[in-house]
């Protein structure tokens, strides 16, 4: 299984072995749940290494998005003739007023009432985290799409949690880093060689993937593949005394070298019956760096990396741009449960919806059925965790109306000009998001989940269109995402709703 330096391995868990006591400095065996294996190393830590700098770019560029040409009797235009000029025509006050009249109405008193926090559930949430943080790490996991992946919202949430319950570290370090829209709470992440990413299918009947807690897998098949992470955080208070790497044991699994703070701890063999494998590094002093080097031409599949301190609170951010709620139905459930058995959560936050309501075939009843299955899957793995649902926020769509006109320059000359007017649909997606939020609220009660309706919060502030017109704007140019300032403002409102802004727990 493992080629090791002497006295490094403290504990090894395997599904077919009988219980035994762990002895410091010696390999020992104990029982664990089905489909898991666990190994622990003890290291000194405390090395002050130079800041990690990647030799190759780590971020992939987002594909350029262009507005969809508008359709209609007088809107669909042929391309402008060669030599023509485009003129941007702003909406007149009358046109804007007429457009705003067609917008989704501000939230009703009933909607505002529905979005009030349930005091008993809030108290239970805090009691759970308070009790956990006094004895160990209190863990909160948040799953969602690009709103969470960007780390602006989650950074505010994480800091509020840790101001209340203690700084427990950075938490999940998403190994998919490099994907557009995904940021990390650590200093640097370098990936070399060929790595293949796998995310769950969105369609229900597609084959399920083998994943860990993050609902993703990342596989290398080449000895030139490597990862190196600077564990020192962008937040000065975060310290990594404990690091856990989750990987997939599989019949054709390969090997990789594990290097911590520049010292090679050994070669890990991932071959075996399909299971969740965990390698945990515990240090007396904070760790600076971890490196993994694939050492042969066989598959090595990684499922997640986690960095934390000894006590306090941790927020594991599993946000991935483009993720949909149906991802929960696209992973092997027993393997996911095995991952949860290795890293359990006191509270779960699901922030889905924006990517679930797109397309031309929006059907609220089908969404209700799908979202119920998401909650069933979550509760099957984490039946006792406190639960919060964050609904999709407000969103509008932009389209352009083009008109080619002839403009007289002088008595003898005219030129073609393309006049472009920007219009906004303030009803279609705000209405869908409001419907999705209402469905989440109904199902939340059934599955013991509090619901924070971000669409109501944004509509109460005037909606996405009004947030775009702020100076500085709180809505990004695509009118789907928010700006960093907008995400921070939403997070502050969420933190207030959750009664996290009242300071350190007694």
Model-derived regions, located:
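Sec-dependent N-terminal signal peptides
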Residues: 1-48
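Conserved, well-structured beta-alpha core segment at the onset of a catalytic domain
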Residues: 5-8, 24-27, 116-166, 357-358
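Membrane/wall-proximal cationic-aromatic binding patches
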Residues: 48-142, 197-200, 205, 211-226
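Soluble non-cytosolic domains of exported or imported proteins
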Residues: 116-119, 134, 138, 147-156, ...
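Conserved SGNH/GDSL esterase-like catalytic core that processes O-acyl groups on lipids
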Residues: 139, 147-372, 376, 380, ...
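Hydrophobic/aromatic beta-strand patches that form the interior of the parallel beta-sheet core
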Residues: 316, 388, 450-452
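Catalytic His-Asp segment of secreted/periplasmic serine-dependent ester chemistry enzymes
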Residues: 333, 395-506
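A short helix->loop->beta-strand "cap" motif at the edges of active sites that frequently abuts
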Residues: 382-387
């Amino acid at each position: 299984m493992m080629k090791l330096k002497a006295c490094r391995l403290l504990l090894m868990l395997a599904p077919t072995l009988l219980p035994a006591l762990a002895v410091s400095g010696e390999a020992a065996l104990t029982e664990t749940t089905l489909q898991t294996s666990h190994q622990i190393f003890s290291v000194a830590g405390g090395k002050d290494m130079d800041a990690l700098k990647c030799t190759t770019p780590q971020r992939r560029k987002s594909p350029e998005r262009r507005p969809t040409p508008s359709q209609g009797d007088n809107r669909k235009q042929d391309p402008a003739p060669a030599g023509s000029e485009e003129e941007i025509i702003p909406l007149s006050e009358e046109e804007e007023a007429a457009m705003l009249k067609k917008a989704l109405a501000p939230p009703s008193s009933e909607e505002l009432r529905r979005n009030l926090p349930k005091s008993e559930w809030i108290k239970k949430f805090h009691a759970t985290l308070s009790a956990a943080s006094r004895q160990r790490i209190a863990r909160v996991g948040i799953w969602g799409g690009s709103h969470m992946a960007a780390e602006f919202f989650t950074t505010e949430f994480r800091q509020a949690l840790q101001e209340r319950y203690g700084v427990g570290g950075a938490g999940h370090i998403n190994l998919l880093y490099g994907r557009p829209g995904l940021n990390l709470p650590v200093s640097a992440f370098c990936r070399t060689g060929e790595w293949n990413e796998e995310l769950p299918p969105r369609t229900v009947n597609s084959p399920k993937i083998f994943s860990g807690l993050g609902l993703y897998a990342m596989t290398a098949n080449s000895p030139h593949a490597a990862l190196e992470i600077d564990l020192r955080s962008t937040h000065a208070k975060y310290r990594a005394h404990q690091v856990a790497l989750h990987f997939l044991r599989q019949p054709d699994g390969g090997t990789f070298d594990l290097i911590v703070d520049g010292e090679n701890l050994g070669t890990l063999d991932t071959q075996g019956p399909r299971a969740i494998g965990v390698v945990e590094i515990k240090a007396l002093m904070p760790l600076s760096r971890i490196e993994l080097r694939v050492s042969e031409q066989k598959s090595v599949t990684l499922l997640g990396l986690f960095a934390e301190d000894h006590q306090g609170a941790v927020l594991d951010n599993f946000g991935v741009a483009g993720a949909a709620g149906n991802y929960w139905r696209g992973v092997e459930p027993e393997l996911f449960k095995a991952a949860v058995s290795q890293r359990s959560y006191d509270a779960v936050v699901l922030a889905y919806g924006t990517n679930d309501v797109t397309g031309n075939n929006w059907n609220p009843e089908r969404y209700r059925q799908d979202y119920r299955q998401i909650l069933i899957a979550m509760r099957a793995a984490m039946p006792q965790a406190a639960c919060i649902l964050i609904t999709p926020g407000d969103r509008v769509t932009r389209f352009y109306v083009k008109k080619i006109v002839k403009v007289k320059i002088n008595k003898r000359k005219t030129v073609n000009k393309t006049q472009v007017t920007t219009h906004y649909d303030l009803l279609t997606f705000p209405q869908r998001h409001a419907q999705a939020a209402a469905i989440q609220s109904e199902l939340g009660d059934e599955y013991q989940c509090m619901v924070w309706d971000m669409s109501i919060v944004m509509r109460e502030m005037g909606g996405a269109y009004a947030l775009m017109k702020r100076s500085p704007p709180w809505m990004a140019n695509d009118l789907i995402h928010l700006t960093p300032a907008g995400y921070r403002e939403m997070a502050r409102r969420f933190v207030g709703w959750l009664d996290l802004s009242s300071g350190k727990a007694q």
